Regions:
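Accessory "access/gating" subregions that flank catalytic or transport cores
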Residues: 2-7, 15-21, 34-140
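Primarily interfacial, aromatic-capped hydrophobic alpha-helices that serve as membrane anchors
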Residues: 173-237
Length: 269
């Protein structure tokens, strides 16, 4: 949103901000969504936005491979998003190793799976706002963030005036309310608009009184970064009771995850 038509500038922000909490595929998810947002400002072709945005991702990565599969399955089953969804589930949706909650259970928030659900909605939604968010929601898993991304990208492409009236009517109720005690929708929009104008000028474009000229950027792949390489689950142990003194845990491997709750005098966290 801050870098309209400037994919590589958007990816640079993702590099610095995304690496605070993610790396590898987790980082690429942000890069890809940012690239599609950036392209949505300058193109009305959703397939172009999906495929051109993918050029910001290194071809050797799992994320690139998964998105490429979805694009190819869309070509193979152009009228059946559920068939494409089944293919995603069979090949990519089986096991989450990045989030401990998803190991060996039917729960998967791997970034490439959620990226697949975003472009599933975009490709099969065919420019229809409600259809797009419906498909990304029904795909499952992280089903609030994914339709927010697919709907946001498509909404950027369409522009505010082309959004369905029933959604715009409801926005008026909440657009000045701070979200989780941070900023409101209107304030966030104002900040993003100002940042975008600054970015356009910084990257060689021009900002006039009634128009802007953007120095369009062709996507350049981000550096290759492989997350959780060679990592697999060896053992999962459940201790279904309270432990007053946590014991020493010995293991052979490269890491361990300990999950539980801390019980205090007045609360559990």
């Amino acid at each position: 949103i801050m870098s309209p038509g400037m994919v590589n500038s958007a990816a640079d922000f993702c590099d610095r901000i995304g690496h605070i909490m993610a790396y590898g595929d987790g980082w690429y998810g942000g890069v890809y969504v940012a690239a599609m947002y950036s392209l949505a400002y300058v193109s009305d072709d959703i397939e172009y936005i999906v495929t051109e945005g993918l050029k910001a991702i290194p071809q050797q990565s799992r994320f690139y491979a998964c998105m490429t599969d979805v694009i190819n399955w869309h070509k193979q089953y152009p009228d059946d998003w559920k068939k494409c969804w089944e293919e995603i589930e069979k090949k990519w949706g089986t096991n989450d190793i990045a989030c401990p909650d998803g190991v060996e259970v039917p729960f998967n928030i791997e970034t490439y799976v959620n990226g697949a659900y975003i472009i599933l909605g975009l490709l099969y939604g065919q420019g229809d706002f409600e259809k797009t968010i419906d498909i990304s929601t029904r795909a499952g898993q992280d089903s609030d963030c994914n339709p927010a991304s697919s709907g946001g990208i498509l909404g950027t492409m369409l522009g505010y005036n082309r959004l369905p009236e029933k959604y715009k009517a409801e926005m008026a109720i909440v657009e000045d309310m701070p979200f989780n005690n941070t900023v409101s929708f209107n304030k966030g929009s104002e900040l993003s608009y100002g940042q975008a104008l600054q970015m356009i000028e910084r990257e060689g474009g021009k900002v006039g009184e009634n128009e802007v000229k953007i120095n369009f950027q062709k996507p350049v792949p981000a550096k290759l970064e492989i997350s959780f390489e060679g990592l697999k689950l060896d053992k999962k142990v459940t201790v279904d009771n309270w432990i007053a003194n946590f014991p020493t845990v010995e293991f052979d491997g490269i890491g361990a995850v300990i999950k539980g709750e801390l019980k205090g005098d007045n609360a559990v966290s």
